[in-house]
C-alpha cells in the first residue's frame, strides 16, 4: 500500500497543469507497471477484462524466456567448445585476456576450460546477450518515450516485446552500436512514424533486423558471426545444407553429424533465440493457450511450408540441395520456428479476420520455402517472408470483409 499511496500522492504533479506535466509519460509507465490504471473506455463499444495491454505484453515477454535462457546457454556452449578446439594452455589464456566477455566470465567465477559446466556456459552467453538486450531496451525505450512526450500520451507496452524479440534474432557477436541502429530503425521508421503501437503495418523487430541485414551484412550473416569464439568460423546448419545437402550437416568442432534432434533441441550455432525449436514451442504453447497468439496463423504457416517444400521435393534438383530439404528440416533450421511462433502472430501487423489469418499464414510458409530454395544468395527466408506478408495482411482482411458483406446482402437483401 505504501508504493500505491506514494504514486497517488505525486500523480497531480504530472497531470495537465502540474509542474512535471511534460514527464507524464514516464510517470504513467512506472505507475502502470505495478498497478492496473483506473481508466475505462468512455465510448462504445468496449469490453471489460482483467487483462489489459500491459499484461498481454508481459505474458508474451515471459513466453520467450525458455528460448532466451537456452539461447544464452547455447552461445556459451558453442563458444567454449570452439575455444578449446582452437587453443590450449597459454594460447587460451592469451585469448581470454584479450576479450572482455571471456575475462568477465572468469572474474565472475566461470571457467572456459574443458571442465566448464552449464553455469559457466550460461554466464558466458549472458555476457553476450544481456549487453545487446540492454542496449536495445535503452535506445528503443528512449525513442518510445520521446514520441510519447511529443504526442502527449502514455508509453505503450508493446516495446517490452519488441526489444526482447529483436535481441533474440541477432547473432551474439553483433556490435552494440549496430544493435542500437537496428532498433532505432525498427521503432522510429517501422512503427512511430505510422502512429505508434497498433498502427504499424510492419513488424518493428523484423524491420530493424532487415535494416541491419541490408546495411551491414558482414555482421549479421556469413560464417564468422554465429559462434562467439575468437578466430573461429563456422556456417549455420541451414547454410551447410544449402551448400551440400543433408550430408554436409557436420559439427565443425567435433566432426560429428548434426542430427534432426540436435537442431530441434538447439545444439547448433545461430541467432541467440532462434536455435531451439523445442524451447520456442513451449513458449508458443503458453501464448496460444492464453489466446494471445492465433493458432490459425501458426497452422497456416505450417500448411504453406509443408505444401511448397513437398512440391520442391517432388521436382528435385541435382544442382540445388535445398530442393531436397524435407519439411521437418525446414521447421528446425534457421529462424522458421521463431518467426512462425512469435513474429507471424504479431496481432498488429498480421491479418485479424479468421480466414485472413489462414491466407496470411499460408503465404508466409510458402514464401519462406521459396526464398530458401530459389534464392541462391540467401538461404534464410523467414524474415523477408513475414515482412512481405505484412504488406498483404490488410488486403486479405479487405477481401474477407467484402465477401462477408456481399454474402449477408444476398441472404437478407438490401
From Swiss-Prot:
Protein family according to the UniProt entry: Belongs to the NqrB/RnfD family.
Gene Ontology molecular function: FMN binding; oxidoreductase activity, acting on NAD(P)H, quinone or similar compound as acceptor
Source organism of this protein record: Vibrio anguillarum
Regions that span the bilayer: 56-76, 82-104, 129-149, 164-184, 275-295, 297-317, 325-345, 358-378, 381-401
Domain of life: Bacteria
GO biological process: respiratory electron transport chain; sodium ion transport; transmembrane transport
Record-given protein name: Na(+)-translocating NADH-quinone reductase subunit B
EC main group: translocase
Modified residues (FMN phosphoryl threonine): 236
Keyword rRNA-binding included in the entry's annotation: no
Annotated localization: Cell inner membrane
Keyword NAD set for record: yes
Keywords noted in UniProt: Cell inner membrane, Cell membrane, Flavoprotein, FMN, Ion transport, Membrane, NAD, Phosphoprotein, Sodium, Sodium transport, Translocase, Transmembrane, Transmembrane helix, Transport, Ubiquinone
Stated role: NQR complex catalyzes the reduction of ubiquinone-1 to ubiquinol by two successive reactions, coupled with the transport of Na(+) ions from the cytoplasm to the periplasm. NqrA to NqrE are probably involved in the second step, the conversion of ubisemiquinone to ubiquinol.
Disulfide bonds: none
Enzyme Commission (EC) number: 7.2.1.1
Chief subcellular location: membrane
Amino acid at each position: 500500500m505504501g508504493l500505491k499511496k506514494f504514486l497517488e500522492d505525486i500523480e497531480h504533479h504530472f497531470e495537465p497543469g502540474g509542474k512535471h506535466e511534460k514527464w507524464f509519460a514516464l510517470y504513467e509507465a512506472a505507475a502502470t507497471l505495478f498497478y492496473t490504471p483506473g481508466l475505462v473506455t468512455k465510448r462504445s463499444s468496449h469490453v471489460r477484462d482483467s487483462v489489459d495491454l500491459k499484461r498481454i505484453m508481459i505474458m508474451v515477454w515471459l513466453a520467450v524466456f525458455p528460448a532466451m535462457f537456452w539461447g544464452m546457454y547455447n552461445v556459451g556452449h558453442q563458444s567454449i567448445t570452439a575455444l578449446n578446439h582452437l587453443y590450449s594452455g597459454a594460447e587460451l589464456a592469451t585469448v581470454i585476456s584479450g576479450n572482455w566477455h571471456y575475462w568477465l566470465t572468469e572474474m565472475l567465477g566461470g571457467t572456459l576450460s574443458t571442465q566448464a559446466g552449464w553455469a559457466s556456459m550460461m554466464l558466458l552467453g549472458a555476457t553476450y546477450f544481456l549487453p545487446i538486450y540492454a542496449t536495445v531496451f535503452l535506445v528503443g525505450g528512449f525513442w518510445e518515450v520521446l514520441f510519447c512526450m511529443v504526442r502527449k500520451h502514455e508509453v505503450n507496452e508493446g516495446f517490452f516485446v519488441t526489444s526482447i524479440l529483436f535481441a533474440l534474432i541477432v547473432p551474439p557477436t553483433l556490435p552494440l552500436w549496430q544493435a542500437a541502429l537496428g532498433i532505432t530503425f525498427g521503432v522510429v521508421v517501422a512503427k512511430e512514424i505510422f502512429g505508434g503501437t497498433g498502427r504499424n503495418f510492419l513488424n518493428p523487430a523484423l524491420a530493424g533486423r532487415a535494416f541491419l541485414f541490408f546495411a551491414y551484412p558482414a555482421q549479421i550473416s556469413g560464417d564468422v558471426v554465429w559462434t562467439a569464439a575468437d578466430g573461429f568460423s563456422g556456417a549455420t546448419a541451414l547454410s551447410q545444407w544449402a551448400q551440400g545437402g543433408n550430408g554436409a550437416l557436420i559439427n565443425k568442432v567435433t566432426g560429428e553429424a548434426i542430427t534432426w534432434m540436435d537442431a530441434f533441441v538447439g545444439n547448433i550455432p545461430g541467432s541467440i533465440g532462434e536455435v531451439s525449436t523445442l524451447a520456442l514451442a513451449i513458449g508458443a504453447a503458453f501464448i496460444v493457450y492464453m489466446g494471445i497468439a492465433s493458432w490459425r496463423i501458426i497452422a497456416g504457416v505450417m500448411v504453406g511450408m509443408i505444401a511448397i517444400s513437398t512440391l520442391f521435393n517432388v521436382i528435385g534438383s541435382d544442382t540445388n540441395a535445398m530442393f531436397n530439404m524435407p519439411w521437418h528440416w525446414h521447421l528446425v533450421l534457421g529462424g522458421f520456428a521463431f518467426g512462425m511462433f512469435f513474429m507471424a502472430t504479431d496481432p498488429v501487423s498480421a491479418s485479424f479476420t479468421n480466414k485472413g489469418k489462414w491466407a496470411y499464414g499460408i503465404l508466409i510458409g510458402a514464401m519462406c520455402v521459396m526464398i530458401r530454395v530459389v534464392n541462391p544468395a540467401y538461404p534464410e527466408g523467414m524474415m523477408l517472408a513475414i515482412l512481405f506478408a505484412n504488406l498483404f495482411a490488410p488486403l486479405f482482411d479487405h477481401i474477407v470483409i467484402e465477401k462477408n458483406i456481399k454474402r449477408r446482402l444476398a441472404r437478407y437483401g438490401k
